[in-house]
Amino acid sequence: MELYFGEYQHVQQEYGVHLRLASDDTQKSRSSQNSKAGSYGVSIRVQGIDGHPYIVLNNTERCLAGTSFSENGPPFPPPVINNLPLHSSNGSVPKENSEELQLPENPYAQPSPIRNLKQPLLHEGKNGVLDRKDGSVKPSHLLNFQRHPELLQPYDPEKNELNLQNHQPSESNWLKTLTEEGINNKKPWTCFPKPSNSQPTSPSLEDPAKSGVTAIRLCSSVVIEDPKKQTSVCVNVQSCTKERVGEEALFTSGRPLTAHSPHAHPETKKTRPDVLPFRRQDSAGPVLDGARSRRSSSSSTTPTSANSLYRFLLDDQECAIHADNVNRHENRRYIPFLPGTGRDIDTGSIPGVDQLIEKFDQKPGLQRRGRSGKRNRINTDDRKRSRSVDSAFPFGLQGNSEYLIEFSRNLGKSSEHLLRPSQVCPQRPLSQERRGKQSVGRTFAKLQGAAHGASCAHSRPPQPNIDGKVLETEGSQESTVIRAPSLGAQSKKEEEVKTATATLMLQNRATATSPDSGAKKISVKTFPSASNTQATPDLLKGQQELTQQTNEETAKQILYNYLKEGSTDNDDATKRKVNLVFEKIQTLKSRAAGSAQGNNQACNSTSEVKDLLEQKSKLTIEVAELQRQLQLEVKNQQNIKEERERMRANLEELRSQHNEKVEENSTLQQRLEESEGELRKNLEELFQVKMEREQHQTEIRDLQDQLSEMHDELDSAKRSEDREKGALIEELLQAKQDLQDLLIAKEEQEDLLRKRERELTALKGALKEEVSSHDQEMDKLKEQYDAELQALRESVEEATKNVEVLASRSNTSEQDQAGTEMRVKLLQEENEKLQGRSEELERRVAQLQRQIEDLKGDEAKAKETLKKYEGEIRQLEEALVHARKEEKEAVSARRALENELEAAQGNLSQTTQEQKQLSEKLKEESEQKEQLRRLKNEMENERWHLGKTIEKLQKEMADIVEASRTSTLELQNQLDEYKEKNRRELAEMQRQLKEKTLEAEKSRLTAMKMQDEMRLMEEELRDYQRAQDEALTKRQLLEQTLKDLEYELEAKSHLKDDRSRLVKQMEDKVSQLEMELEEERNNSDLLSERISRSREQMEQLRNELLQERAARQDLECDKISLERQNKDLKSRIIHLEGSYRSSKEGLVVQMEARIAELEDRLESEERDRANLQLSNRRLERKVKELVMQVDDEHLSLTDQKDQLSLRLKAMKRQVEEAEEEIDRLESSKKKLQRELEEQMDMNEHLQGQLNSMKKDLRLKKLPSKVLDDMDDDDDLSTDGGSLYEAPVSYTFSKDSTVASQI
């Protein structure tokens, strides 16, 4: 909902407010309870004269005229703005001091002294806790202006402040002033002092005993200066100024700002059903759980305004309201009388309107700053109605978490909790005091509704706006504790800082929810009205009717109206959407209510505050998501609308185009009908011309000569056709002979195949015998080997067995492969021969098709010539029509006819030229007449000649057709015979092929088996190769052992050498057999491919035969169609014979030239076709050759691949052997390294021994030197030498041996 309020702040316009809330028919239920003689009604008018708004409260029974207002009259006080914290240090207000305000039963009567002693004076401590000034003294009922009579002093406009320092009288002084005011009712209005910006004070309330008129000026301003950011908050309700409207709401809706009446004191424990705690929209107090809304606010500015959206979250209407429990429980609806909040009822005398106008029209005075001076004059065009923003933020601009909690908990709740007296079910009759208080509450609430609902006076009844604020304390016990302001400097500073923060928060929210953000915002529509408009009883009735509706119905209807605007959905769809949104809002409301109850129970718990903040943020996110969804739906609906409009526009365009085309078609049909009528007329004229121009026979003879020449050309063409037919027949006979030759060749090939099959069977038997003999020899050799090499059987038996199996299989596979290769070769040769013959047949058939195509071309030429003749005849007819018109009319008629001919013929340039020639020739009318006579004669002769030629052509065509039929029948018979023969041959061939296929399948099966066996053999060979590798290693070991044995068995070495040679030969044979097996595999693959190719070729031949049959059938159909066309041409020629009489010589010459040109073109086209066919054949041959080359290359590549695979295998073996050698070398290296290390160890050991020996020698040498020194006489003694030389030599000998060992 913050999005809405952010936008609501931008729509701050000033409007003049004129309300009249009088006692009308809708208040009868209230007046029933207040059935007192002194009952009164209230007439509220907010009139703006020169920028000064006033609220005038009239007594309906006695409207007294007072004194007039001066132009610079005394201003009225704003509502007092104080700092009342939601959670004080002690957490709550004592229950004893929570008594509500007790209003007098009659506002015009003086208050009783008993009540005046009940209200204690409250003052605010430094910590913001409400403290009782005198705890022992009973609370007094004195009001703020009673306790502070200095408030009644006039406002000093020059200093723009109140002098409150020298005026602090006691209660006795206030009683004196009260009695003086009661006695001397001289003042027409009460002069409330206006507080300055730095010195907020409490407003005063005039004595309620006064009667008359109270004019309250709703002007208040507070300017707050912050050292960091200068912000100004100004509250004003005006009629014809350009000032901002929401200033009072901004000022009073900030969090630290709370409007209180200074005479609202703690209530007693008495039950007061007529005074109910009320939660205002801009109050900063906590949410009253008990004060559930039973009635929505009466009106709103627009269906999308905040108050209309608040209705969505109103609580259910369940509990009945009784007079006893209204005060302290959930159903508190009446508003306490809070002076200074805009609801003050001044009972003073009401001055007349003339006096007020005279007051304002007096001396203008000086323009003063602040609120004291007269407002600046504004143009009447710029004057707008003012409107407060109190309804936008119900708790004021709060910046902390507590305000957000309260705001989220009270989203959607109505600010006006007003009950009619008829809705309250009293259990006992009310006293006069309570009735008076109820009437005061009603007038008080109506004041607020009048102040707030003036902005929507045109569209809907005014919505009540409540300025009173209620604070809930412990549990369900609710109390309205309204504090009096303190005049200390600290409270002033705090208020200024808090108001500044409030305005900043509001501005931030306004910027956050600016239209630049993508979220959808609810527009606020305001309806400005003139300054003299008033609320009529009809509007009040509408307001009451709206209040009688339930909250859910109003909310749903508002949502329905909102969703219905700008959407094309049905009513059901919009209602469903409304229900869904309403259910979601109810869930959100239930959550907010649950969170509100938890907060009321524990107001001081910060954890719950955080949870509620999180819930509030989630709710705002959900609301934003819902708004986004609404935006998307609205956008989608708009897009759908645009698409529908586009589709409609397109449909309209298409319809218009269709209508235009229909009109064009109708016009064209009319033109066609007109042209047909003209053609009929022309034909009739032609017949008349023919009858008239019978004299021109001489001219027609020339044309007959030309026609004879044409006939000669036609005869030559017929002869050429006869020759071509003969050639075709000869070619057909040759084809038949070729077919017979092919059949004979096929029979010969079949005989050859049979012979070769027999030879293959014989070869198979011989091969089998050879294989058996070879097996027997091998068995013998094996027995010899087994007998001779008993010691080596275990190592050699596996290899020999594998070799035997491979040899037997390889022999059988070789034999089978040889037989299959021979068969395949024979089949390939036969297939090649058949292919050659089939190609020859295809060529012959192609030649026949060419000839048939030539015939078709000739027939097409004849058709074209006939069509040309027909066109020329039509042209001649048109020329005759032109001639007649030229005889009758001038050259202009000729040109018109030429234009008509050009329009009829279109883009035919040749015909236009001919028409021009005809127009030039037709200028000489006399010559043309003679020519026409001659032409008539010639045309008659031409008729005869044409008839004869046509008959001849028909006969020739019949002969040709019969010949072609006979030839086709013969060909069909021959083809049938050939087909039958082919079928028989094919059946025989199929049988043979089936047999061969069976054999081939058997061979295939055998080949497959062989392949499987070969695969197994390959696997076995691989295993065998592995085994061979292992055997080779074993053989190497065995060879070493054999070599050892050979040394031992030299006598048996020769036999063993022979046997080893045989084994090597067998191994070589085995390797050769393996290679042959691989080759046989490749050959078998090739054979299978060739067989598949031969099958494909046979299928192609069959398809070609079928194509030939289809082509023959097409030719027959073409012949039939040609016959029909010939018949049609004959009929056309007969029809056109009459038209040829009116033809001319020049036309005939042109026709002949055209025919020659067309024949040349046809010949050139035929040549081009022949060249194209030759080129196509050449290309086909090249393609076949390329295919053969590709196949050969593929075969060569496969062979190369196989060879490469074998090489790779060999290389792999070599690599494996090399790796084994490398491993051996590495092992040998490791052994050598170990040996070297051992030798190094030995060397080190020996060196240590040497060193020890050297040390010993040195030690032995030292005593010998000592002994030599001891012998003085003999340097050398034999004894000494014999003693010491021997060990020295011995030691040196040891050293020498050690050195030699090293």
Swiss-Prot record:
The keyword Coiled coil applies. Residues 604-1258 form a coiled coil. Residues 75-104, 186-209, 251-305, 364-392, 655-675, 903-929, 1263-1287 are annotated as: Disordered. Keywords: Cell junction, Chromosomal rearrangement, Coiled coil, Phosphoprotein, Tight junction. Residues 296-305 have a biased composition (Low complexity). Its main location: other. One of its GO terms (biological process) is negative regulation of small GTPase mediated signal transduction. Residues 195-204 have a biased composition (Polar residues). The modification Phosphoserine is found at S112, S202, S283, S297, S298, S388, S391, S486, S708. A motif (ZIM) lies at residues 37-51. Residues 264-282, 378-388, 655-664, 917-929 have a biased composition (Basic and acidic residues). Residues 1263-1302 are annotated as: Tail. It is found in: Cell junction, Tight junction. Residues 1-554 are annotated as: Head. GO terms for cellular component: bicellular tight junction; myosin complex; protein-containing complex. It comes from the Eukaryota. Residues 366-377 have a biased composition (Basic residues). Smooth muscle, spleen, testis, fetal brain, amygdala, corpus callosum, cerebellum, thalamus and subthalamic nucleus of adult brain. The head region is responsible for both junction and actin filament-based distribution. Homodimer or oligomer. Interacts with CD2AP and SH3BP1; probably part of a complex at cell junctions. It is linked to Aromatase excess syndrome: An autosomal dominant disorder characterized by increased extraglandular aromatization of steroids that presents with heterosexual precocity in males and isosexual precocity in females. May be involved in anchoring the apical junctional complex, especially tight junctions, to actin-based cytoskeletons. Belongs to the cingulin family. This is Cingulin-like protein 1. The gene is CGNL1.
